[in-house]
Amino acid sequence: MASHLELNNGTKMPTLGLGTWKSPPGQVTEAVKVAIDLGYRHIDCAQVYQNEKEVGVALQEKLKEQVVKRQDLFIVSKLWCTFHDKSMVKGAFQKTLSDLQLDYLDLYLIHWPTGFKPGPDYFPLDASGNVIPSDTDFVDTWTAMEQLVDEGLVKTIGVSNFNPLQIERILNKPGLKYKPAVNQIECHPYLTQEKLIEYCHSKGIVVTAYSPLGSPDRPWAKPEDPSLLEDPRIKAIAAKYNKTTAQVLIRFPIQRNLVVIPKSVTPVRIAENLKVFDFEVSSEDMATLLSYNRNWRVCALMSCAKHKDYPFHAEV
């Protein structure tokens, strides 16, 4: 299995990255330092995670120590929904760049297709608890993303949480300069995303799987929610390979030719999550894992369900 996947502009993207969603600011610096020391080269960030400054401290330290060269790192961040207005994209990008203490990013994604009302709140809500949308169209936002590439600020651009119809709208944009190179989506055995992945691959778009372990530390977890890590069927498959359940859950997307970004701030787990290139899950076990799909989402973003660009209504 490849340790890198080639993007549609020839850039190579490491198959395994460190996720930083929900990594507490006080722990994420150490987590990123440990990850780089262990051999991680791909770090997945976002402005809305509110910890990019701390990630930047770790990156700077490792670059200064010459543990790694900048060109060997693959740093990803994402444009938040309150900055979809074309005039706001560059400012949001520059904030991320300065927080991460970098001169350029390797990949910048539109985090969600849904534009929100600009302002200090990341989730501006009305009295009924619904997100207040902005009067923006992500196709226009894409034009501003393309300008970042032209200015040499980012090597590659892509999307996240977009459905095929939404990607199609970008691909059909008049005067399109750069196709989305990546679509980052939630993906694990309870949400296998076969149709969406098949669509993306048919368009030469690499898919990154987030929440590969089902995001067990999500704040809104309910006791009755299914747990991938505790699923006895997945535990049994892992035992067969003398691997942990997490390692099988990380290996699963890799064998589907996806990029995967498990999050951890625990050094032992960060190391364990990297040890997924020395075994192969059989095609029978892969088919079994795929059969566990139940279209169960960790990240359904229900506060946006009434938004015109909410991505999860149509399973197309």
UniProtKB/Swiss-Prot annotation:
A single BP term in Gene Ontology: epithelial cell maturation
Tissue expression as described in the entry: Abundant in the testis, skeletal muscle and kidney.
Binding site for substrate: 111
Binding site for NADP(+): 10-19, 211-273
Disruption phenotype: Deficient mice have no apparent developmental or reproductive abnormality except a defect in their urine-concentrating ability, which resulted in polyuria and polydipsia.
Compartment list: Cytoplasm
Keyword set, alphabetical order: Acetylation, Cytoplasm, Lipid metabolism, NADP, Oxidoreductase, Phosphoprotein
Modification type N-acetylalanine: residues: 2
CDD domains according to UniProt: AKR_AKR1B1-19
Enzyme Commission number(s) of this protein: 1.1.1.21, 1.1.1.300, 1.1.1.372, 1.1.1.54
Residues bearing PTM Phosphoserine: 3
GO MF annotations, alphabetized: aldose reductase (NADPH) activity; all-trans-retinol dehydrogenase (NADP+) activity; allyl-alcohol dehydrogenase activity; glyceraldehyde oxidoreductase activity; glycerol dehydrogenase (NADP+) activity; L-glucuronate reductase activity; prostaglandin H2 endoperoxidase reductase activity; retinal dehydrogenase activity
Chain segments annotated as transmembrane: none
Main location: cytoplasm
Domain of life: Eukaryota
Modification sites for N6-acetyllysine: 95, 222, 263
Record's GO cellular component terms: cytosol; nucleoplasm
Active site: 49 (proton donor)
Function in brief: Catalyzes the NADPH-dependent reduction of a wide variety of carbonyl-containing compounds to their corresponding alcohols. Displays enzymatic activity towards endogenous metabolites such as aromatic and aliphatic aldehydes, ketones, monosacharides, bile acids and xenobiotics substrates. Key enzyme in the polyol pathway, catalyzes reduction of glucose to sorbitol during hyperglycemia. Reduces steroids and their derivatives and prostaglandins. Displays low enzymatic activity toward all-trans-retinal, 9-cis-retinal, and 13-cis-retinal.
The family this protein is said to belong to: Belongs to the aldo/keto reductase family.
Assembly and interaction partners: Monomer.
Protein name listed in UniProt: Aldo-keto reductase family 1 member B1
Species this protein is from: Mus musculus (Mouse)
